[in-house]
Regions:
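Juxtamembrane loop-helix boundary motifs flanking transmembrane segments in multi-pass membrane proteins
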Residues: 19, 23, 27, 54, ...
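Transmembrane-helix bundle segments that line or gate the permeation/cavity pathway
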Residues: 40-81, 85-88, 92-122, 147-171
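Alpha-helical transmembrane segments of integral membrane proteins
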Residues: 3, 28, 32, 36, ...
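Juxtamembrane inter-helical linkers in multi-pass membrane proteins
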Residues: 69, 115-137, 173-183
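Membrane-embedded alpha-helical bundles of multi-pass integral membrane proteins
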Residues: 86-87, 92, 138, 186-196
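Conserved small/polar residues in nucleotide/adenosyl-binding loops
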Residues: 199-200
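N-terminal alpha-helical transmembrane segments of multi-pass membrane transport
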Residues: 1-60
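Loop-to-transmembrane boundary segments
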Residues: 135-150
Length: 201
């Protein structure tokens, strides 16, 4: 995982070394960027599974990552509990990022350009349409993620009240907030008491 992190950081520094010029994303560019972004991010996202050897097949690792980022919820893992704590967290975290949209997440943390990113946001965001909540798309993305983070935190707290262990509560909340359903137990919520099931409902 350390190798993947270092590679990603190095590439990030390379691309951020040159300040981008002001430009506007039109719908065509937004759709193309979204498609390319999904491919690149999915490849990088599957590397922790593959390099760690916990999912030895690159194809299976890529499938699991794409399923996470797209919040599909399909899995190639016969035994979810065979993954390490770190990999299970990453698996659920891909769901959390994908629940709001991978590129919306990037818009929230990275200034992609000085121009307008509304069409990039429209191409990536879930739902029928995206309006400007605030004048700048980066601020809109941040606002959406603040709300998203708040709802996730509330779920974690409620699960803790239901006597779920902290690690389980965090991973489960990441998986359910993105509406994908990735979990860390083979028998899902049957491992916990009834109050946990009611919390998720």
């Amino acid at each position: 995982e350390t190798v993947v992190a270092l590679i990603s950081i190095a590439i990030g520094f390379i691309f951020s070394a040159k300040k981008p010029r002001d430009f506007t994303f039109y719908l065509k560019e937004g759709c193309a960027t979204t498609a390319l972004g999904w491919i690149v991010l999915s490849i990088f996202g599957c590397l922790p599974f593959y390099i760690s050897g916990e999912i030895p097949s690159f194809t299976d690792a890529l499938f699991e990552t794409i399923s996470g980022f797209t919040t599909t919820g399909a899995s190639i893992l016969p035994e979810v509990e065979s993954l390490s704590y770190c990999m299970n967290f990453w698996r659920c975290f891909t769901h959390w990022i994908g629940g709001m949209g991978v590129l919306v997440f990037l818009l929230a943390i990275i200034p992609l350009s000085g121009g307008s990113n509304i069409n990039l946001m429209r191409a990536e965001s879930p739902g029928p349409s995206v309006g400007k909540l605030v004048p700048k798309m980066r601020h809109t993305a941040r606002l959406l993620y603040i709300i998203y983070f708040g709802l996730t935190t509330m779920e974690i707290i409620f699960l803790l009240f239901g006597k779920m262990p902290l690690y389980d509560a965090i991973c489960t909340s990441l998986g359910t907030a993105g509406t994908g359903g990735f979990g860390i137990k083979n028998d899902s919520f049957c491992s916990y008491n009834v109050s946990v099931s009611y919390t998720h409902l």
